[in-house]
A protein has these predicted regions:
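Secretory targeting and sorting signals
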Residues: 1-15
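Predominantly extracellular/secreted and cell-surface proteins with exposed
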Residues: 30-94
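A short, terminal or domain-edge coil/loop segment
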Residues: 73-75, 79-81, 100-109
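Low-complexity intrinsically disordered segments
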Residues: 88-99, 104-107, 113-117
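A short, structured loop/turn motif at beta-sheet edges
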Residues: 16-21, 44-48, 62-66, 91-100, ...
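Edge beta-strand at a domain terminus
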Residues: 105-144
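Residues that flank catalytic or metal-binding motifs in active/ligand-binding sites
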Residues: 20, 38, 88, 120-122
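Tryptophan-anchored aromatic micro-motifs
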Residues: 16-38, 101-104
Length: 144
C-alpha cells in the first residue's frame, strides 16, 4: 500500500499543500442534477492526512498525487423509501485548493433496481462552514 522511503530522500512538501480543519459542507451534484449535502467535521491526523466525521461514520482522507482521496462505504436510499446500509463503496477525490472533485459510488449489493457493480459519479464541492464560536453579545437586562 505504501512504499518505504530511502534514507536521505526528500519527503513530500506538505507545507505547500492547503490542509483542512474545522466544519465543512459537502454538496454532491448527482448525474440527474439533484443535490445532496452532508456536514463534515475535519481534523488533521498528520502530514497529508485528515479524519473526516460525517453523520455516524468517519474515515481518513489521504493526500495522494496532489489530491485528497477518501475511500469509504456508503448507505443507499432508494426513491421507494427502501434503504441499504453500507450498500455502496465510494471513492472520492478532490483538489486541496479548490475543494472540488468527484465521488464515484459502486453498488456492492443490488439496490433500487440496480445490480451490484452499478456505478454513479457525482460532482462534489466542499465549503468551509463559518465558525459559530464567536463571542456572544450580552443581552441588556431590563430595568424596572
Amino acid at each position: 500500500m505504501f512504499a518505504g522511503l530511502v534514507v536521505g530522500a526528500a519527503g513530500p512538501a506538505w507545507a505547500d499543500t492547503p490542509t483542512m480543519d474545522g466544519s465543512y459542507t459537502e454538496t454532491a451534484t448527482l448525474p440527474s442534477g439533484g443535490t445532496l449535502t452532508s456536514s463534515w467535521t475535519v481534523n488533521s491526523c498528520g502530514d497529508g492526512c485528515v479524519f473526516i466525521k460525517a453523520g455516524a461514520g468517519g474515515s481518513q482522507a489521504r493526500l495522494v498525487d496532489g489530491q485528497w482521496v477518501l475511500d469509504t462505504l456508503n448507505n443507499i436510499s432508494c426513491a421507494d423509501g427502501s434503504y441499504t446500509q453500507y450498500g455502496a463503496s465510494s471513492h472520492m477525490t478532490w483538489d486541496p485548493t479548490t475543494l472540488t472533485g468527484t465521488a464515484q459510488h459502486t453498488y456492492i449489493v443490488p439496490a433500487c433496481g440496480r445490480p451490484p457493480g452499478y456505478t454513479e459519479t457525482d460532482q462534489i464541492k466542499i465549503e468551509q462552514t463559518p465558525s459559530t464560536s464567536a463571542t456572544p453579545t450580552p443581552t441588556p437586562t431590563p430595568t424596572s
